[in-house]
């Protein structure tokens, strides 16, 4: 039996070992298909990262699909039931690293556009593709750099679907219409090292910090809103001491992260954390990493089109959620357009035996094509 177009392309993409930041020829596959449809292609290589921007048309609105060809490492190969880069179908599921995150989505995007253009060669507006090989890694030379380049020349995306695996039980049951912001603080509290038997000759930075850290951890940063839960403060890493039980440490290192709603911004968080630390009279250094602002698409033509497109396939509307981690949608949202995420079921992403239901690839392709019809068909 011959594979369907979306399954064949998904297999071809999965077979390429594109572990971040490698692309391994995945983008060339997509570019070849898009060139045949009349897309203008711009390859953008930044450091070790391969990206491309493709566009068909010069009119507004500019609708784009966004995604990544890179995947996380496979891990221990002996834990996989099948080789991770040899796409295999078992009981109706396509297995392989990247099947759900997110080579299945990429295949669905390309095939959906092929079908749409075949029916609507003179469609309204413009269609774009923003594809990177640096989403699973440090995300410094990928989508963010392409967005910066586009914005510098005034080429802003009006509407964008990011193909991240948004679904939970069945494909399309959840559409992410926003994401929380993320900011990380690396705090070093300085004390004076000494012998534990002579605490009066030392200054223990762990003891000095505990009240301040407790206050930060128990602060109500906000109450959230209709779209976002309250901001979360979490401490993932702490370290101090030499490993010896008789030495008071000279430094105490605390790393913390806040996932924040649209009720806050980076500047407000920095100010409130600094005020808390200063109130406790600590001697400290604090380095911030700004991972991304929150974004929200609560209304608009894109959201209406995606909800309708999903309902036409599933006979039920998707839930609109902002849960989960960050995505490249946060960079695209800087352009001021509407951004949502729609992709496969996320139950196996980043795990051994990652897989996607073959039928879900067909449904996702239909959802993407229906969205294009709602937005750009004449």
UniProtKB/Swiss-Prot annotation:
Binding site for Zn(2+) 1: 68, 101, 164
Pathway listed: Amino-acid biosynthesis; L-lysine biosynthesis via DAP pathway; LL-2,6-diaminopimelate from (S)-tetrahydrodipicolinate (succinylase route): step 3/3
Keyword line: Amino-acid biosynthesis, Cobalt, Diaminopimelate biosynthesis, Hydrolase, Lysine biosynthesis, Metal-binding, Zinc
Any one biological process term the GO annotation gives: lysine biosynthetic process via diaminopimelate
Source superkingdom: Bacteria
Obligatory cofactor(s): Zn(2+); Co(2+)
Catalysis performed (reactions): N-succinyl-(2S,6S)-2,6-diaminopimelate + H2O = (2S,6S)-2,6-diaminopimelate + succinate
Binding site for Zn(2+) 2: 101, 136, 350
Record text on cofactor binding: Binds 2 Zn(2+) or Co(2+) ions per subunit.
EC number: 3.5.1.18
Keyword Amino-acid biosynthesis: yes
Pfam families for the chain: M20_dimer, Peptidase_M20
Molecular function via GO: acetylornithine deacetylase activity; cobalt ion binding; succinyl-diaminopimelate desuccinylase activity; zinc ion binding
Catalytic center residues: 70, 135
Family, similarity comment: Belongs to the peptidase M20A family. DapE subfamily.
HAMAP family: DapE
Subunit structure: Homodimer.
Role according to the record: Catalyzes the hydrolysis of N-succinyl-L,L-diaminopimelic acid (SDAP), forming succinate and LL-2,6-diaminopimelate (DAP), an intermediate involved in the bacterial biosynthesis of lysine and meso-diaminopimelic acid, an essential component of bacterial cell walls.
Protein name listed in UniProt: Succinyl-diaminopimelate desuccinylase
Gene giving rise to this polypeptide: dapE
């Amino acid at each position: 039996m011959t594979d369907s177009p979306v399954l064949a392309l998904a297999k071809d993409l999965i077979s390429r070992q594109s572990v971040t930041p490698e692309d391994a020829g995945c983008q060339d596959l997509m570019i070849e298909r898009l060139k045949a449809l009349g897309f203008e292609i711009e390859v953008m290589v930044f450091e070790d990262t391969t990206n491309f921007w493709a566009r068909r048309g010069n009119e507004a609105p500019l609708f784009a699909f966004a995604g990544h060809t890179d995947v996380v490492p496979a891990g221990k190969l002996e834990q996989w039931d099948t080789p991770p880069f040899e796409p295999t179908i078992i009981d109706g599921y396509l297995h392989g690293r990247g099947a759900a995150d997110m080579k299945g989505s990429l295949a669905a995007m390309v095939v959906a556009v092929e079908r749409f253009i075949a029916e609507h060669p003179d469609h309204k507006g413009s269609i774009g593709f923003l594809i990177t090989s640096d989403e699973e890694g440090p995300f410094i030379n990928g989508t963010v750099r392409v967005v910066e380049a586009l914005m510098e020349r005034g080429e802003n995306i009006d509407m964008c679907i990011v193909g991240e695996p948004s679904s939970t039980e069945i494909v399309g049951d959840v559409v992410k219409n926003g994401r929380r912001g993320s900011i990380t603080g690396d705090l070093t509290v300085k004390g004076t090292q000494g012998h534990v038997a002579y605490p009066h000759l030392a200054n223990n930075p762990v003891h000095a910090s505990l009240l301040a850290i407790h206050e930060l951890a128990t602060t109500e940063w906000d109450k959230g809103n209709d779209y976002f839960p309250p901001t979360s403060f979490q401490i993932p890493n702490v370290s101090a001491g030499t490993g010896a039980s008789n030495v008071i440490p000279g430094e105490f290192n605390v790393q913390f992260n806040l996932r924040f709603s649209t009720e806050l911004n980076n500047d407000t968080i920095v100010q409130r954390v600094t005020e808390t630390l200063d109130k406790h009279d600590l001697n400290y250094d604090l380095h911030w990493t700004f991972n991304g602002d929150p974004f929200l698409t609560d209304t608009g033509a894109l959201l209406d089109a995606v909800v309708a497109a999903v309902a036409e396939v599933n006979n039920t509307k998707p839930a609109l959620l902002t849960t989960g981690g960050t995505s490249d949608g946060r960079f695209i949202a800087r352009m001021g357009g509407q951004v949502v995420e729609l992709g496969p079921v996320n139950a196996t992403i980043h795990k051994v035996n990652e897989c996607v239901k073959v039928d879900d690839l067909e449904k996702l392709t239909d959802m993407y094509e229906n969205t294009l019809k709602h937005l750009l068909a004449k």
